[in-house]
Structures are given as structure tokens and as C-alpha cells.
Curated annotation (Swiss-Prot):
Keywords: Ribonucleoprotein, Ribosomal protein. This is Large ribosomal subunit protein eL39. InterPro entries: Ribosomal_eL39 (IPR000077), Ribosomal_eL39_dom_sf (IPR023626). The keyword DNA repair does not apply. The gene is rpl39e.
């Protein structure tokens, strides 16, 4: 992908990147282990973003 991206697309890609991270340990502990995994896991090669 090109290096020069529109700002709106860049922001959407950044949000998708944040959503793909694991949940923090403190959230796991605070909810008494109810949150166990990422709600929408996405692999960079298998699933494409519909941006």
C-alpha cells in the first residue's frame, strides 16, 4: 500500500489496529475473568479490512 494515505483512511486503519490488540490484564482481573479474549480477532493476512 502506498505511503501517502488520506487522513480518514489512516485513522480508520489505526482504530482497526487498536481493536486487534489483546485485552489488558487489569481488565481481565477487574471483570473477574469475564472478558477472556478479543471480541473481533483479525489476522493481517487472512482477513481484509473493508475500508
Amino acid at each position: 500500500m502506498s505511503r501517502n494515505k488520506p487522513l480518514a483512511k489512516k485513522l480508520r486503519m489505526a482504530k482497526a489496529n487498536k481493536q486487534n490488540r489483546r485485552i489488558p490484564i487489569w481488565a481481565y482481573a477487574k471483570t473477574n475473568r469475564k472478558l477472556r479474549y478479543r471480541p473481533k480477532p483479525r489476522h493481517w493476512r487472512r482477513n481484509s479490512l473493508k475500508l
